[in-house]
Amino acid sequence: MGVITSESEYVSSLSAEKLYRGIVEDGNIIYPKALPRFIEKAETLEGDGGPGTIKKLTFVGDFGSTKQHIDMVDRENCAYTYSVYEGIALSDQPLEKIVFEFKLVPTPEEGCIVKSTTKYYTKGDDIELSKDYLEAGIERFEGFTKAVESFLLANPDYNKDSN
């Protein structure tokens, strides 16, 4: 098995705590609202949201679903890691799983820097993923995060107590 890594970061105007809560703790509620053209349903299949939890995202139309395993949750440091191990995200490439790691770093301006690392675990050591595929993955992750950010900005009272 090979591992191919890509990284990205961008600045959010939301506090790390508020964005973290929206993505990690309230994702099952927010994802379908923030991305209604893409996500039909987000649900926890087993677990309490901590490491070992299994989540499922069901996409709109005929795009199927993905299952995620929560690997690490660190609310204090606004860090989160999960693995996609089943579903549409793995169907078009020879991948065993995709691991998403992200950390939200507070900025002096009360926003945060969204840092993400994506690790693609291939079904062989000799497999390469195209630059376009890796860039599209970064764009999807950033688009997803920015959609949650936009939802929270448009609904400022949503998780006000964590701002």
UniProtKB/Swiss-Prot annotation:
Does the record bear Transmembrane helix in its keywords?
A: no
Where in the body, by tissue, does this protein show up?
Expressed in nodules, but not in leaves, stems, flowers and roots. Specifically located in the nodule cortex.
What InterPro entries is this protein classified in?
Bet_v_I/MLP, Bet_v_I_allergen, Plant_def-hormone_signal, START-like_dom_sf
UniProt keyword Nuclease present: no
Keywords (A to Z) from UniProt? Cytokinin signaling pathway, Nodulation, Pathogenesis-related protein, Plant defense
- Check the UniProt entry and state the signal peptide residues, or none: none
Q: Enumerate the residues binding trans-zeatin.
A: 68, 82, 133
Please name the GO terms of the biological process aspect recorded for this protein, alphabetically: abscisic acid-activated signaling pathway; cytokinin-activated signaling pathway; defense response; nodulation
Q: How does it assemble?
A: Homodimer.
Described by its record, this protein's role is as follows:
May be involved in nodule organogenesis rather in the processes related to nitrogen fixation or interactions with the bacteria. May regulate nodulation by controlling the levels of freely available cytokinins.
User: Can you name this protein?
Assistant: Nodulin-13
Q: Which organism is it from?
A: Medicago truncatula
